[in-house]
Amino acid sequence: MKRCVLGIDGGGTKTVCVLATSDGKVIGRGSGGPANPNLVSAPEIKEALQKAILEVIRNLPELQIEAVCAGIAGVGASEEKQAAMRNVIWQILSTPPFYNTLRKGFNPTKNIEVVSDVVIALVAGAGERHGIVAISGTGSVVYGETVKGQKIKVGGWGYHLDEGSGYEIGRMALKEILKAYDVSGETTPLAQKVLNVWNLSSVRDVVNYIYQKTTKPTDIANLAKIVNSAAGAGDEASKEILRKAASDLYSDISAVAKQIDFGKEGAALVLSGGVLTNVEIVREIIVEKVRVELPAIKSIQLCREPVKGAVVLALKNSTL
């Protein structure tokens, strides 16, 4: 019988669930749909979590789950939302086949912890709830927390408004290629890359594609990869878009760093999300400015798997 914990990362695009042993080793992994309560309904959230958890345990029957931690996008610091999500997880775990995997005396109030997704990303990178995490994926947010409980958040307003996000990079790219086409009738190298990805024949088709009902926010945000590729090939417009994104993200990081007291020991900065982990121009600009201008930041860590932070927190709530 393996004694384990469940770590869950419920985002706006997908849900990831991992099963880990007492030493943090991941022995099972599952995935489901989005779990952000601001974007999908309660039944959809339950379905996503149920699918992800079932994928983890179905091939590992000899289990004893000691604790669960879920980092959920859209929950924030709201105790009401956290409690609602805890209830959903308990509804899943308290029915077969899940219930048979829980340790005797499992208490949902004590053994199921729900936090914001920013918290698990911070812990995954820094190893504790002390430091700053900057996340840039479809949306963006910067969050700081100290061991004394001081907490500061900048951004996280939603993908329509978040600066330095994948969606914002994609939106700026679309404006750039449409403006160039209006002024000169030119299909720029960046425009051609977008047309290829979206399988369009002309820049004239771009606006219709953007506003059709089947186009998702992630379709726009994923253009950040195209902008990064174009910038790497020397496209100046793409480079400028990425510089602007880096500047906006750094401003948010700086705002948090200057409002929070990390003491003499300072803190780590954790960089997470597809833009910060995969777009080198953005990351390198931020890293350089942080090292020069923010002495409270003693180290910079990349976080590619926030769910590992959920495992760390679950282990703290377990008897392992």
Q: Could you describe each region identified by the protein language model?
A:
Residues 70:
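Long C-terminal interaction/binding lobes of large macromolecular proteins
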Residues 1-67, 79, 105, 124-132, ...:
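ATP-binding/phosphotransfer module of carbohydrate and carboxylate kinases, centering on a glycine-rich
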Residues 73:
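Short loop/turn segments at strand-loop or loop-helix junctions that form parts
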Residues 76-187:
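Phosphate-binding/catalytic loop of phosphoryl-transfer enzymes
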